[in-house]
C-alpha cells in the first residue's frame, strides 16, 4: 500500500528491495545470492532486513555483509518502521512473513 503522504514515483532511478533472511534466503542460499546479484546488476539497491535481534546468530549473515549487502536487525520491530527511521525507503519487499513488515512483536 502506497503511503499517501509521500509522492508516488514509479520511475525513480534506483529502487530499494528489502529481502528477509530466515525462510527466504536460508531456503536456498546459493540461489538467492544469484538473485540478489541480478537485482544489483539491473540497478536495484538491495538490503537485508531481518526480524532477528542482533544477538541471534549475527555471524550467520556475515556472508551477505561480505558480499556488500547492508544487513539490518530489527529486533522484532516492524521492518518498515525500522528502516524508515534510518531514512531508508523500501520499494519492494520479499518476505515469507509479510506481517513482520508492518507489525512489531517486541
Tell where the protein language model's regions lie, with residue ranges.
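Alpha-helical substrate-recognition element adjacent to the catalytic core
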Residues: 1-80
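Asp-based, Mg2+/Mn2+-dependent phosphohydrolase catalytic module
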Residues: 4, 98-106
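Conserved Lys-Pro-Asp/Glu-containing loop-to-beta segment of HAD-superfamily phosphomonoesterases
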Residues: 80-99
